[in-house]
Amino acid sequence: MDAIKKKMQMLKLDKENALDRAEQAEADKKAAEDRSKQLEDELVSLQKKLKGTEDELDKYSEALKDAQEKLELAEKKATDAEADVASLNRRIQLVEEELDRAQERLATALQKLEEAEKAADESERGMKVIESRAQKDEEKMEIQEIQLKEAKHIAEDADRKYEEVARKLVIIESDLERAEERAELSEGKCAELEEELKTVTNNLKSLEAQAEKYSQKEDKYEEEIKVLSDKLKEAETRAEFAERSVTKLEKSIDDLEDELYAQKLKYKAISEELDHALNDMTSI
């Protein structure tokens, strides 16, 4: 009888231990499942971060590409501005040469006008001499008349020359006015061109500053891309580690489930043995 009681106590103790182990196995299983879910959540979070890192890398790559395109456009604008400056300098030189030629034509016209005035004075003096001789010497009337006709012819010729010179003078004055107007326009244009040149120079300096700024940004983007690449590698490593951890935990869960099943079988066997013992006691 004592042996049976002792055996029953041992069976009860084994049953309690089996229950404790079963509960512990259940707790371990739940903890493993919680840890597995936590790792799965971390894996999803890491995958999202990885996707965000890839998107950010694409964004910086696109920004770097835009910066390079803007830099190329700035260099093209600077080249075009230099070509415009050279063209404007050539135009200024042509205007200055045309102004010099106009001034030379004006000086020639003034000289011809002075010569015409001298010829007119000489003609007037000749007519006075002829008239004086006509008054003093009537016997030489025919000669004087001839001389008078000649003088008139000379005077008429001089008048024609004077009119022609005057007409040419008007034309020359008109040319001079146009030349002065063109000179004023040229001076105004030169001032505008100088102002445009200053603007182009300032724009060129601004473009150079922007190019330097873009170069600095490019270095910064390259450094950020390098940092992001390192973070990407680190995230990939963590993701791989998390996947391996999940695999291990899944295997641990399977092992725990197997152990739980074995404990249940053992508990069932102990319960059956305990029932048999109770039946034996009842029979006694």
UniProtKB/Swiss-Prot annotation:
PTM summary: Phosphorylated at Ser-283 by DAPK1 in response to oxidative stress and this phosphorylation enhances stress fiber formation in endothelial cells.
Annotated stretches, region: Disordered: 1-38, 116-136
Domain of life of the native organism: Eukaryota
Predominant subcellular localization, coarse grouping: cytoplasm
A GO cellular component annotation in the UniProt record: bleb
One Pfam family of this chain: Tropomyosin
Residues the record lists as N-acetylmethionine modifications: M1
Coiled coil: 1-284
Subcellular location: Cytoplasm, Cytoskeleton
Record PTM Phosphotyrosine, positions in chain: Y261
InterPro entries named in the record: Tropomyosin
UniProt function note: Binds to actin filaments in muscle and non-muscle cells. Plays a central role, in association with the troponin complex, in the calcium dependent regulation of vertebrate striated muscle contraction. Smooth muscle contraction is regulated by interaction with caldesmon. In non-muscle cells is implicated in stabilizing cytoskeleton actin filaments.
Record family assignment: Belongs to the tropomyosin family.
Annotated domain remarks: The molecule is in a coiled coil structure that is formed by 2 polypeptide chains. The sequence exhibits a prominent seven-residues periodicity.
Protein name: Tropomyosin alpha-1 chain
Organism in which the protein naturally occurs: Rattus norvegicus
Lineage: Eukaryota, Metazoa, Chordata, Craniata, Vertebrata
Gene field: Tpm1
